[in-house]
Amino acid sequence: MTKSEKRQHDILRYIFSHVSDSGYPPTVREICNAVGLSSTSTVHGHLSKLESKGLIKRDPTKPRAIEITLAGLEMLDELPNKTQIPIVGTVTAGEPILAVEENRDYFPLPPYFESADDLFMLSIRGESMINAGILDGDQVIVRKQSSANNGEIVIAMTEENEATCKRFFKEDGYYRLQPENDTMDPIILENVTILGKVVGLYRDLI
């Protein structure tokens, strides 16, 4: 990487950080101050190079109209799938129902996760997991995996291809999907498919 390319990378990184922190891109003067350049014309030159490489898009008639393209995000290793979790539908915490994988929306990656790789989010319907603090209407963050240890909370697919959120136990000759609700019975299965392990929870308090 040449000195000029390093400077352009620093500018691109600062634009991304400013948008992430403030919700809008910086001015050229703010870029100057951030990367240690005194001339706005020098920054304009670097921005033109970034634009010609397809890393940003600009509107020259507006002072803050700088948008980082997907190619620019890829260079920064900040593609959306690294920082957002797909919301793929609804799963039951009651009687099993089909989980609908719609990929209709995305949820920002919580700060305690390093990467969104292999994560997805499901909305919970039902009250079978209330003793574990998972309530009707909550959204759970799930890590895709095909196995689980006894006692872990999982999203499991039954023999009828219906998905449910339960605590997993492998018993002698069968599987037990245990609800966390004293009024409900466990689901006993000869075969079960683990879709993933529940690793987080989000609840809208508003």
From Swiss-Prot:
Please give the Gene Ontology molecular function terms for this protein. DNA binding; serine-type endopeptidase activity
Q: Which UniProt keywords apply?
A: Autocatalytic cleavage, DNA damage, DNA repair, DNA replication, DNA-binding, Hydrolase, Repressor, SOS response, Transcription, Transcription regulation
Q: DNA-binding region located at which positions? A: 28-48
Q: Which Enzyme Commission number(s) are on file for it?
A: 3.4.21.88
Q: Which PANTHER family match?
A: LEXA REPRESSOR (PTHR33516), LEXA REPRESSOR-RELATED (PTHR33516:SF2)
**Subunit:** Homodimer.
**Name of the molecule in the record:** LexA repressor
Q: Which organism is it from?
A: Ligilactobacillus salivarius (strain UCC118) (Lactobacillus salivarius)
| The encoding gene | lexA
